[in-house]
């Protein structure tokens, strides 16, 4: 019986995936397209965890000249059907740098990580360099300084171009340069407050490695964003940018419908096709329908072990979420209103800036939508030409991303509401002042973003959040009591003095809000919700019925309150 291939979670080394008999979604024809492109430098921009590192690893193993052949890795792969392209296999020196680990809280710490990356790449080529009679003594000394991490700070600005020159001399062949997640250090520096220092370092390295490097055969870079206004790519005449808006290479990153269907069939999970589409599909790369590969693989691995495993957001821990949440939490009222509409399924229309920079996000509100699009939080559903510019219509791609937006809103709400002094509000609850309670809740509702597709859950979470921190009391939510489920109980922690019952209803119109508050109060009585409190010997029971209609509320005190 043939061994079932492993699902490769977090494995970004192409050789390891093949050697360990992991399931591999064949993207090798990307190599053919790369050779046909004729570009000196090509930049792929895709969201985080969309297979960029794995694809660059595949490119490295294809082109790199090594002592032991790696040609077997491409046996029976799509590229093997093209002998004219297989002739390029194992023919070039390759420099591979992944900057995704440069996420430290200070520039100094990030620079130390960069030095480690340079050291590792020099070590990887040390044998070839020192065994060659083509390397001058002064250059060998400089190589040693990089390996020992004793090079001058200024020398690191040209470290990549220096290594490419040495390798080109050793192999008598120009170098292929691969730089993965080039903008992670910039994103991190933006979030941590040392953006200018980092952009100066990256600019210096790229200028020497990509613009004025006569030893370069071609370069491939990956990242989320195209950062050009800081002059990283200025003057690079033969730069080809392939963003999510371009048709070129549109299926090279992420999984197509066909690839997902084949994988589900392989693991006997075809019945999950509709669910996985709802949760993890929805991306539109150059008009191609694309699934999030990280989330799809994680779910397939989980479901392969337990077919009843629930769908969950696997992508929520990506680094860009920190900035997305910050953008939403710190945005103006107009932006919050648009986010609210997005969550409720209403598209946003905006011009898109392909060269948006992290430094511009705070000062240009239009850049927010560009950032959200390129980092995977929006997808294009339509575009039209307006005043010779492209106006894009965008929506949230799938349920997984929708949940991330909702979590951001909860965080925003918590920060703003919980920072207020709520003692007067709590006092109003105990003093049975329904009008005052209504006023507080109404004001808070007006300030927060709402989403209404799961109305009761939203308002339930809203009020539970408001009531958290009620000193001397604890919030108990959604439990069986009497003949049914109540919405919220507030119980005194000491002495079993006071218990408070909240029941919510959604009113279809503003005019019916009082009626629905009465219905909520009647439900408390009909279902005997107070039974649990009576059993626990609470001496005083207060009952509130609350109706909600979007950002309006109506609070009513039960006449049967003690």
Question: Residue ranges of each PLM-predicted region?
Answer:
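Structural signature of nuclease core domains in nucleic-acid processing machines
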Residues: 434-562
């Amino acid at each position: 019986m043939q061994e079932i291939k492993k699902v490769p979670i977090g494995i970004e080394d192409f050789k390891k995936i093949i050697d360990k008999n992991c399931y591999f979604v064949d993207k090798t024809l990307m190599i053919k397209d790369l050779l046909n492109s004729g570009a000196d430098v090509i930049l792929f921009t895709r969201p985080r965890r969309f297979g960029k590192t794995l694809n660059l690893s595949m490119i490295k193993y294809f082109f790199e000249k090594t002592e032991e052949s790696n040609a077997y890795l491409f046996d029976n792969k799509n590229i093997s059907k093209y002998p004219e392209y297989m002739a390029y296999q194992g023919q070039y020196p390759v420099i591979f740098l992944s900057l995704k680990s440069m996420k430290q809280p200070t520039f100094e710490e990030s620079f130390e990580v960069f030095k480690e990356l340079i050291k590792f790449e020099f070590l990887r080529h040390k044998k070839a360099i020192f065994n060659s009679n083509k390397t001058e003594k002064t250059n060998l000394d400089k190589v040693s300084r990089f390996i020992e991490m004793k090079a001058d700070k200024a020398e690191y600005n040209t470290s990549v171009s220096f290594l490419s020159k040495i390798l080109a001399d050793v192999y008598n062949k120009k170098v292929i340069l691969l730089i993965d997640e080039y903008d992670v250090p910039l994103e991190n520096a933006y979030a941590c407050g040392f953006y200018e220092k980092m952009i100066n370092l990256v600019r210096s390295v790229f200028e020497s490695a990509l613009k004025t490097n006569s030893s370069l055969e071609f370069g491939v870079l990956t990242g989320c964003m195209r950062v050009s206004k800081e002059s990283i790519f200025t003057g690079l005449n033969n730069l080809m940018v392939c963003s999510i808006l371009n048709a070129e290479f549109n299926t090279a990153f992420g999984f197509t419908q066909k690839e997902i269907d084949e994988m589900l069939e392989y693991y006997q999970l075809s019945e999950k096709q509709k669910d996985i589409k709802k949760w993890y599909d929805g991306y539109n790369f150059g008009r191609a329908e694309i699934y999030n590969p990280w989330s799809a693989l994680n779910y397939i691995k989980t479901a392969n072990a337990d077919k009843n495993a629930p769908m969950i957001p696997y992508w929520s821990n990506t680094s860009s979420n920190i900035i997305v949440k910050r953008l939403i939490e710190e945005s103006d009222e107009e932006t919050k209103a648009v986010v609210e509409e997005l969550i409720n399924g209403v598209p946003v229309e905006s011009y898109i800036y392909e060269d948006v920079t992290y430094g511009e996000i705070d000062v240009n509100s239009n850049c927010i939508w560009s950032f959200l699009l390129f980092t995977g939080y929006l997808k294009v559903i339509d575009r039209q030409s307006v005043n010779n510019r492209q106006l894009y219509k965008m929506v949230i791609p799938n349920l997984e991303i929708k949940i991330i937006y909702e979590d951001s809103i909860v965080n925003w709400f918590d920060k703003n509401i919980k920072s207020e002094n709520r003692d007067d509000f709590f006092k109003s609850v105990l003093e049975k002042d329904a009008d005052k309670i209504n006023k507080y809740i109404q004001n808070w509702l007006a300030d927060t973003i709402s989403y209404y597709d799961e109305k009761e859950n939203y308002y339930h979470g809203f009020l539970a959040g408001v009531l958290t921190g009620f000193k001397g009391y604890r919030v108990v939510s959604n439990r069986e009591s009497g003949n049914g489920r109540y919405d919220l109980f507030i119980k005194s922690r000491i002495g079993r003095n006071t218990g408070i019952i909240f029941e919510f209803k959604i009113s279809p119109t503003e005019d019916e809000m009082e009626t629905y508050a009465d219905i909520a109060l009647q439900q408390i009585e009909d279902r005997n919700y107070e039974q649990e409190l009576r059993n626990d010997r609470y001496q005083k029971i207060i009952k509130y019925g609350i109706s909600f209609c979007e950002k309006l509320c109506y609070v009513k005190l039960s006449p049967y309150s003690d």
